[in-house]
Amino acid sequence: ADIVMTQTPSSVSAAVGGTVTIKCQASESIGNELAWYQQKPGQPPKLLIYRASKLASGVSSRFKGSGSGTEFTLTISGVQCDDAGIYYCQQDWNSNNVVNNFGGGTEVVVK
């Protein structure tokens, strides 16, 4: 059976300078094979975090990924207006070598 990725919350509002926490749960263990992306309207997704906690090149250290197994978290600290967008977790490996298995997305609104 396919692994299901469940993201919470579906939407979150944050003040500039605040902190946002997004959670992603896998229906079975995926080790640390979890990526986080940010997407803005009309743009392709931008990789933020790979292997659960590794910061992609050029990405601000305000973004932090943690977790392993089935429970993962993306934390955005010192939220800036430019952080607004939709964030997705992605299972980037499974036993069937199926990729591009994304969570449902979390909209981040910055006030």
From Swiss-Prot:
Start and end residues of each stretch annotated as Framework-4: 102-111
Region spans: Framework-3: 58-89
Record region (Complementarity-determining-1): 25-35
Cited Gene3D superfamilies: Immunoglobulins
Region (Framework-2): 36-50
One Pfam family cited in the UniProt record for this chain: V-set
SUPFAM superfamilies named in the record: Immunoglobulin
Alphabetized SMART domains for the sequence: IG, IGv
UniProt keywords, alphabetically: Adaptive immunity, Immunity, Immunoglobulin
InterPro entries: Ig-like_dom, Ig-like_dom_sf, Ig-like_fold, Ig_sub, Ig_V-set, IgV_Light_Chain
BP-aspect Gene Ontology terms: adaptive immune response
Region described as Framework-1: 1-24
Region ranges (Complementarity-determining-3): 90-101
Region (Complementarity-determining-2): 51-57
GO cellular component, one term: immunoglobulin complex
Additional comment: This chain was obtained from antibody to type III pneumococci and was isolated from the serum of a single rabbit.
Protein name (Swiss-Prot/TrEMBL): Ig kappa chain V region 3368
The organism of origin for this protein: Oryctolagus cuniculus
